[in-house]
Amino acid sequence: SSPTVSPGHQPPKVYRAMKRDPSDNLPVVGSTSSSELGARPGVDITIDAAGSVVLDASGMSVAPCWRDLDFTRIPRRLRHIVPGATGANSTSCFTLGAGPFHRGIIASRLELIPDQGQALVTHGVVAPMQVVARAQYQADLENTRAEWQIDEK
């Protein structure tokens, strides 16, 4: 059986800049842009010959704080907080979870893998916990959509 989130579990708090759907203020789902809720094959994730996601510590990029996002991802409207921000104003800084930015379960079948080898970790990925088809990984990411909230404070 697949690992699941236990009651009372605090998923790691992560941030990602994504396009906002104006109809519900939630992230736009997709796998063709770095500003969608999803992962791009061949860019963010490796897909094997069978169409499964390779478990190579790659996945959908996230940060422990929206200020840690690359300045090209932070919307320009936030330049007063992050000087030099050049991201599209059509994106918003979304957050999910509440726990520390440590390796752990984000949601059913998904885990946070923070980058290694840095004293101050400013990046990680949301990756599948086991080998799954690309479509299942995308569905698992999409299933987190309602949990994301805008946080630009």
What are these regions (language model features)?
Residues S1-K153:
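NAD-dependent ADP-ribosyltransferases
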